[in-house]
Amino acid sequence: MPAQPRPDRILHGSIPVETLRFGLPIAVGMGLQTVFNLVDAYIVSRLTPDVAGPALGAIGICDQLTAIGTILSYGLTTASTALIAQAHGRGDKAEVRRIAWQSMLAVTALSILFGFLSIGLAGPIVAGAVGAKGKVSELGTEYLRVIGGGSFSIYFLFQLTGIQRALGSAKTPVLLLVLSNVLNLFLAVLLVYGPGPAPPVFAWGPVIAEALHIPRLELVGAAWATVLARTLTLIPVVVLLARRFDVMGKGSITKPDPAMLKAILRMGWPSSAQFVVRMLAMLLTHSLVARIFTTATDQSATTALGIVFRLETMAFFIAMGWGSAAQTFVAQNLGAGQRGRARYSGVFSAIYSGVMLLLVAFAFARYGTPIVEFFDKSPTVVAISTTYIAYMVWSYVGLGTGVVLGSAITGSGATRTTLVTDLAVVLALQVPASIAAVLLPGASLPRLWTAIAIAYCASGIVYAIVFRFVRWMDAMTEAHVSDVAPP
């Protein structure tokens, strides 16, 4: 009989202690994932100067584009794992299996859709929609075709590790994500540099690449490394789900269940749309900077954004880690009828997230210049990047608070509440303020950074108000899937 994680601590342990015990490994693991991504960016930054700068800019743009698909997938993960955690809290094992399998079918369909879109429309998206120019556009198109075409790997990785977290396992999903990034680092050195040249720290790479006849692929090699690493990591993830968690036991693998899929999509689309709204706001920033502050021969501002957005992703992912913990605690405790514990788990998750993000903000504020110079020593790029850091880092606490409390709310199934909240902040404040910052007389990058920082702070304040005063836990009855008859 496969071993099952016991929900006793989540349902009966001390909330401050257990949210810390469960959430800290997830938050640290998510943060480490972005550290590996920064190392990936370092590998690209050590290509020849005519390629390195545009490549960093291209990665920054493509990260935001591919994040749209990842976030849509994450919405399905958020919905299905909340339902799985609720069923697990009720002790309904058959329901856990049924929701898990149907959610994987939904992720499969999304993978096919975004794979075709990325391969077929990469050029018009990068150059036309975003407004990338010159070498950035050329490299970004090649990169997007590979990383977007292989998007199934990250969709399934998040979905399957999310199921493990919903069942009460915090450390194993983190270790698997770290494994994926270690593989990514190893493969990136081989595929980006090929037989050489390579920086001294990666001198082992060209030796292996030459022995295996691996060509020098430069930026597109980084994309292939990422897709291959994630795909290889799926193997132990599937084995663990089948053997340890017994999710793929007898009777769980069935044909598509329209009623179940509809229930998952009904709950998941607002969560997806919520994060897509956030990502579109970041893409708007990229587009405004690319169109107004760059030329065909000088893409320094785009390169700078490519660097600082990767740093910002660390703060966002740490918050998402605490948010995942909050969602699991809220869902399982609501499933067991413990509303008070559900609410306090969200509060403590937000507090722990805020403390971690203050430490991150201090580190970036103190060491911002050497961090940026680690990737690009160009004076213009360094100046733009460090100005962004100075204006933005302390607002990450507000951004993280919004992410964590929003995730806690989605644990109850109230995904429409989080969607409306994000729409209000982004459409009523961030978008108009960003556009005004660059279109009104005296347009400047610092004014744009100020507008975004204010929006991040507002997000945390608004979510705190919603979490405290809106009756979001009442959505639990609407999200209950047990009323959907099994086939």
Label every model-predicted segment:
Residues 1-23, 84-152, 183-186, 194-269, ...:
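Short alpha-helical transmembrane segments in multi-pass integral membrane proteins
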Residues 31, 35-57, 126-134, 190-194, ...:
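Helix-terminus/linker motif at the lipid-water interface of multi-pass membrane proteins
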Residues 21-44, 146, 157, 229-233, ...:
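Transmembrane helical elements of multi-pass membrane transporters/channels
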Residues 56-116, 154-168, 172-173, 290, ...:
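Small-residue-rich hydrophobic transmembrane alpha-helices
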Residues 53-64, 140, 144, 297-314, ...:
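Small-residue hotspots at the loop-to-helix junctions and early N-terminal turns
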Residues 74-77, 146-165, 173-181, 222-237, ...:
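Short runs within selected transmembrane alpha-helices of multi-pass transporters and secretion channels
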Residues 12, 16-35, 39, 65-72, ...:
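Residue-level signal for short hydrophobic patches within transmembrane helices
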Residues 26, 30, 42, 82, ...:
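Transmembrane alpha-helix boundary and packing residues in multipass membrane permease domains
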